[in-house]
From Swiss-Prot:
Its EC number is 4.6.1.-. GO terms for cellular component: extracellular region. This is Dermonecrotic toxin LhSicTox-alphaIA2avi. One of its GO terms (molecular function) is metal ion binding. Disulfide bonds join C45-C51, C47-C190. One of its GO terms (biological process) is killing of cells of another organism. It is found in: Secreted. CDD domains: GDPD_like_SMaseD_PLD (cd08576). Expressed by the venom gland. Mg(2+) binds at E25, D27, D85. SUPFAM superfamilies: PLC-like phosphodiesterases. Pfam families: GDPD_2.
Length: 273
């Protein structure tokens, strides 16, 4: 999965997919009442990027729905996965469950079209704080209460705080999650970060009894870093330059080893070599 980083304006969906991304990451900010409000990152952000692009969250969802609904004039068949980077740092811990409920209602209405031929991409809810694990239950309970438990088949989870792998496993246990787990590791492109924890996550994924299904590394903008990440066995790389990642995947060392994921590749099933 080539994951376009910080895609917060509707026009950027096409821009990143046309550069080679089959997945995008979108920031979600919340108001004081835990309503998802804007697709907005803010300052500071990655070097070389504008931090200030935004849409109202519900408007973005409608644009995303158009891009991921077969038959729509705006349909992008390559776009199969969307990571919502949930900026829950602005919320009190006791608002996490409420944020999950409201997120579920927004997605159900504006993205999934109340279960009636809505957007078809897989969704990953990425949460920065392990203490906010109740967001997951708020989300899953709400979809069930609204009569759409089948949509949970399209939803996965990520804790993005670079916490110890064992601590992340405990948070999932508390949240009642087993499966559909992506594990992120990374840092802004302005700084360097080694691959120690990525390798630990990959080992958990491949152990047969770990909690992780897929591992992604962020933010990867350079060819050398891309090669290191692919060599470490990641499933996804998040990038500001999808074309750079696509180029590396076409190099002789990689073109027979890795390929771009398609809709038929489940993002919840651990790939067995």
């Amino acid at each position: 999965w080539i994951m376009g980083h910080m895609v917060n304006a509707i026009y950027q969906i096409d821009e990143f997919v046309n550069l080679g991304a089959n997945s995008i990451e979108t920031d979600v900010s919340f108001d004081d009442n835990a309503n998802p409000e804007y697709t907005y990152h803010g300052i500071p952000c990655d070097c070389g990027r504008s931090c200030l692009k935004w849409e109202n969250y519900n408007d973005f969802l409608k644009g995303l729905r158009s891009a991921t609904t077969p038959g729509n004039s705006k349909y992008q068949s390559k776009l199969i996965l969307v990571v919502f980077d949930l900026k829950t740092g602005s919320l009190y811990d006791n608002q996490a469950s409420e944020a999950g409920k409201k997120l579920a209602k927004n997605l159900l209405k504006h993205y999934w079209n109340n279960g009636n031929n809505g957007g078809g991409a897989y969704i990953v809810l990425s949460i920065p704080d392990l203490n906010h694990y109740p967001l997951i239950k708020g989300f899953t309970d709400t979809l069930k209460q609204e009569g759409h438990p089948e949509l949970l088949e399209k939803v996965g989870y990520d804790f993005s705080g670079n916490d110890a792998v064992g601590d992340v496993a405990k948070a999932y246990k508390k949240a009642g999650v087993s499966g559909h787990v992506w594990q992120s590791d990374g840092i802004t492109n302005c700084l360097l970060r080694g691959l120690t924890r990525v390798k630990e996550a990959v080992a958990n994924r491949d152990s047969g009894n770990g909690y992780i299904n897929k591992v992604y590394y962020w933010t990867v903008d350079k060819r050398a870093t891309t090669r290191d990440a692919l060599d470490a066995g990641v499933d996804g790389v998040m990038t500001n330059y999808p074309d750079v990642i696509a180029d590396v995947m076409n190099e002789a060392a990689y073109k027979n080893k890795v390929r771009l994921a398609t809709y038929e590749d489940s993002p919840w099933v651990t790939f067995k070599k």
